[in-house]
Amino acid sequence: MSISRSRFRVRLNNADLSRMSSLLIKILILLGVAAAAVFVLFQLGSSAASFTFEFREDVIDLNILNTVRREANVGNLSDVNLEELSTRELLLTMHSHIDNANTMCNRKIRMGYTGDGGWEICDDPDVRPRVPCIIYSFGISYDFSFDDDAAKLYGCHVYSFDPSMRREKDFYDRSSHVHFYKIGLSGTTYVNQDNKWLLMTFRDIREKLGHTNTTVDIVKMDIESSEWEALPEMVASGELRRVKQLLLEYHLVDQTRDYLLPRLKAIQAVESVGFQKFYVHKNHACTVSSVFPVTRTRCYEVHYLKR
């Protein structure tokens, strides 16, 4: 007697298949969770002896950070009455404001050494130096790497200034496009009787070089605190309006009100003619201040552009 195979077939409809698939997925998930739990327990067990919680003194103090946010002026200073700020507010504003860029440069190119001595140039089409172009570089200290690179890349004539380089002639052409002058930048034109350095205003230097009615594409300044004397004259004379990019190092050596207020006013004046910060670099070679919850320095390399 033969028995038809059709009697022993299991007929599964769509609902049965769905329930079986759901059950299989749940089983796989449970197996995965169990495996993960075993792995975590193993890791904890192997490192239990060294696993401890400790207080981190370098964690940002949010109370201090909130104070900085509340009392410091980070944005543009053009509408700020600096005279009304307390000494504490001036200090917080000085460091917080300098350290925050407020415009975009899509393409920055570093000229000079990758470490100290190099500077970023904004290479965006609307501010990029184009032949014929002029660059002033104040503060060389025998390092012409920025000047040489900028001259090679853009084909600009670069005028390098430093009165402290005793081994150099008063004037010479380093190359066909890099020209050195033993002159320093200041707020007035005079000869320093202590070291016999010739110091000149930005306007007088431009007149000396025949650039009175010419736009200067880039001014780079690293002149060891003399920027605080030079900048007000550059703004007051109207000469800074003829500059497209301003790259300078701000040097801060005191925290008193009499020191901070005129320097913040100088920064305010720079911004009043349209300059905005596209890049800021903290120079860690300078002594840092512990007033802030994050690293601060006394030397800020600030890169401005004017569109």
PLM regions and their residue ranges:
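Phosphate/nucleotide-binding beta-alpha loop and adjacent structural elements of enzyme active sites
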Residues: 2-307
